[in-house]
């Protein structure tokens, strides 16, 4: 059974997204990109993020949605801002799609590379390899989103 999965890597400057089709252990990248968030007031940035997500859902339907949880940051302002973006994304996904899966950065790294402490570059290398792509995927926000989708696909196979 083919499953269309949306993976999301939330960020305060860019939000990576990836759409994969998963079928019996074979994953195909359908689309990947960024929701670019321009420097502005927090309210405008959140609006921009939600509008970008609306557009993705308008152009595609999904069986599953997975999002990466926010990472630990040392700057409290950064944590608060990311938490607000994450909250807005969560609400938007719940309104449009319903339930979604959440994975920590360590879970994603472990699922894709086998190492919970892998670097972003190691994740990018494995994403490229797992999908059989010839070109590097840039920026790393996009590879992270693909990794989230791949993690969810692997998790679904384990549960089935």
UniProtKB/Swiss-Prot annotation:
Principal place of residence: cytoplasm
- List the subcellular locations: Cytoplasm
**Catalysis performed (reactions):** Endonucleolytic cleavage at a junction such as a reciprocal single-stranded crossover between two homologous DNA duplexes (Holliday junction)
Q: What is its EC number?
A: 3.1.21.10
State the encoding gene. Answer: ruvC
- Which residues are Mg(2+) 1-binding? 9, 141
For biological process, the GO terms are: DNA recombination; DNA repair
Recorded hits in InterPro entries, A to Z, give: RNaseH-like_sf (IPR012337), RNaseH_sf (IPR036397), X-over_junc_endoDNase_Mg_BS (IPR020563), X-over_junc_endoDNase_RuvC (IPR002176)
Recorded protein name is Crossover junction endodeoxyribonuclease RuvC
